[in-house]
């Protein structure tokens, strides 16, 4: 087995049976004090985000509620258990919210489910005191313009789907990558920056596009064009990406002497010192809109208001879980011209459905096409899961994505932004 096969075998190490595929989600949110200040992550004298995380971790222990983690700017992330049924996932989501609200209320804290911090510059937000994130911060300073914004001031909803086999992995990643402009529009919820409305700028999407050209963006931007070779192409790609950190003998992140992921993994593979944890750490240093771990992860969704968090899960699940939809999308997307796809990806930075899309159709046409397919797939499952998407979709089609809806309501309110958001 060569190195590429070793990496690929790790990605394909937790295959599910076709009828047993599950989905899990990761939900990030910001936390503010009662005075509407971001909760610090490193306070020495006051209750901070680190204390909050530890309290949540203890409260969730043994309750099968999922797990909590702490993001670099103090955002709280919850990871659900995996489920095959979105109604069961919803039950888990409600348990998480109840536990989070109970804990926040004890300390007069407020959560905010939004894609980008509406008020603060990244310079005003402490970075968590962890080696991994300090190394990441240093890397972002050298390799992009908005990495500090990404680390400190963004929150998202991420989806993790089981892989069935290699062909499934290739085709799903290709389909999800092609869907990026659609999901980026439907699930945009970043209306404000530094206290000001952003107009029709798709802000969180824009921040990620300008974070690190080597490890972000779409798979298409890194030469992954064809579904049949996508996983092999992905393995070749990750080997070229600059390495942020490596793991020491105790599996803790440390500064690395290697230039790229491939340099480190090759060296350890040749010396028979390569561990599965080294491969896993390398895969987690890739931030494309869709990426492989031992799952397929969808990463291009803004954090949405709590009541809408399952909307993107339903949208993607109506496609991922439905063979008919996957075949139809694979057939359609395989016809698209690469340059058209690149132009459409750029169009997703602006919230305007009147723009042109691929194959002679408008942005609007493709949003409707994909959404209707998703709903039909959900209905074929017969679990009433379409309820999590249909009303949300109708609102977005009629009034624009939440980024635009929020700004319109704010301008009509005549209130200060703080009062509008927190009241």
Identify the residue ranges that each predicted region occupies.
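Terminal catalytic/cofactor-binding subdomain
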Residues: 1-147, 153, 171, 294, ...
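Long, well-ordered mid-to-C-terminal structural blocks that present hydrophobic/aromatic surfaces
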Residues: 254-340
């Amino acid at each position: 087995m060569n190195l590429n096969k070793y990496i690929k075998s790790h990605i394909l190490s937790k295959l599910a049976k076709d009828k047993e595929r599950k989905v899990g989600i990761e939900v990030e949110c910001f936390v503010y004090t009662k005075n509407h200040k971001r909760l610090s992550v490193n306070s020495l004298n006051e209750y901070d985000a680190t204390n909050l995380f530890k309290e949540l971790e203890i409260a969730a222990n043994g309750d099968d509620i999922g797990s909590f983690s702490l993001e670099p700017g103090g955002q709280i992330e919850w990871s659900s258990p995996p489920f095959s049924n979105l109604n069961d996932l919803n039950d888990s989501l409600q348990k998480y919210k109840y536990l989070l609200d109970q804990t926040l209320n004890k300390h007069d804290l407020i959560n905010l489910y939004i894609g980008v911090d509406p008020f603060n510059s990244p310079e005003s937000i402490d970075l968590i005191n962890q080696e991994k994130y300090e190394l990441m911060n240093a890397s972002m300073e050298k390799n992009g313009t908005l990495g500090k914004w990404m680390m400190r001031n963004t929150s998202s909803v991420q989806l993790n789907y089981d892989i069935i086999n290699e062909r499934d992995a290739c085709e799903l990643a290709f389909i999800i990558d092609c869907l990026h402009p659609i999901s980026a529009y439907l699930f945009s919820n970043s209306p404000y920056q530094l206290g000001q409305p952003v107009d029709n700028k798709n802000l969180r999407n824009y921040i990620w596009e300008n974070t690190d050209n080597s490890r972000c963006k779409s798979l298409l931007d890194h030469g992954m064009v064809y579904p049949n070779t996508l996983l092999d192409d992905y393995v070749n790609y990750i080997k070229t990406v600059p390495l942020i950190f490596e793991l020491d003998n105790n599996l803790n992140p440390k500064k690395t002497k290697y230039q790229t992921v491939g340099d480190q993994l090759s060296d350890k593979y040749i010396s028979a010192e390569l561990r599965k944890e080294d491969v896993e750490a390398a895969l987690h240093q890739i931030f494309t809109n869709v990426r492989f771990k031992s799952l397929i992860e969808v990463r291009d969704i803004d954090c949405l208001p709590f009541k809408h968090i399952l909307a993107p899960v339903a949208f993607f699940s109506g496609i991922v879980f439905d063979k008919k939809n996957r075949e139809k999308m694979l057939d359609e997307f395989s016809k698209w011209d690469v340059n058209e796809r690149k132009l459409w990806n750029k169009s997703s930075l602006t919230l305007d459905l009147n723009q042109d899309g691929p194959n002679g159709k408008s942005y609007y046409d493709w949003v409707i096409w994909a959404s209707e397919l998703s709903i039909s797939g959900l209905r074929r499952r017969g679990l009433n899961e379409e309820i999590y998407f249909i009303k949300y979709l109708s609102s977005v089609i009629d009034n624009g994505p939440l980024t635009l809806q929020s700004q319109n309501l704010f301008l009509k309110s005549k209130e200060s932004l703080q009062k509008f958001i927190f009241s």
